[in-house]
């Protein structure tokens, strides 16, 4: 079982932007103290650089299990820049002895998709056309080649407010590429899919799992207000396990019947608004770990 800095308020839209993001050392201490055995990287450099990351993780008995790598796959003019950034992230993996870490490839999205979270399941017009999918697949192939050349097996993270959000978009990625799939229970729910069905149907491709719960009504409010994905984060669309609308009991029952043997990463993205929020987030992750022990036997 692993956790991630985003559960404590440290991710791409907060680090270096908001004043109440907790220090990395306190996050690592909280992850270890809650009973998790690994962590994802968070924004590159947040947990440490190539000289310090391995020691920081070892001091808390944590393995590096993955790191989020956004790439603008639909925009080839940005591939050189984004793949160079990916290569630098893989340098961190190597420096941390992250031999089991998954490069978590994700679509860098577009301004349009960021404005319309949770809509692609019912409105395919905001998705890619056939030429766009061909470009997208070529970009994914290049990223996979880079990861494998560096000795890491990648995974692809479907994500709300990107070009791979809805089940039909995930299926296109699986059809057009050979990349493994990161199944995220929360983002799939927000994208109009069912995590249990996905685990059953896509199980042979799944090589990494994020465990999330979500409040459906928060996303519904965001859509009703014509708000964007950052606003969904600010409104707290992700919640503690067992308190939202994802049928996690069904998901874990299906998981127990599957052959999956990779990491499970608990994520509860939150945006810190005061110094107190870091302590509240740490308490939430303790409760999430206890929920998993009680309900999933993990």
Residue ranges and their predicted role:
Residues 40, 66, 102-104, 155, ...:
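Conserved beta-strand positions in the central sheet of alpha/beta enzyme cores
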Residues 59, 78-181:
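Active-site acidic/histidine proton-transfer and metal-coordination neighborhood
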Residues 48-68:
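Aromatic-lined substrate-binding rim segments of carbohydrate-active enzymes
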Residues 1-32, 58, 91, 97, ...:
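Histidine-acidic metal/acid-base catalytic patches
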Residues 38-52, 72-82, 160-165, 187-193, ...:
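Acidic-and-aromatic substrate-binding clefts and catalytic sites of carbohydrate-active enzymes
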Residues 5-7, 63, 68-70, 107-111, ...:
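Short, flexible active-site-adjacent loop segments at beta-strand->alpha-helix junctions, enriched
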Residues 7-23, 42, 74-81, 125-133, ...:
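Active-site mouth loops of central-metabolism enzymes
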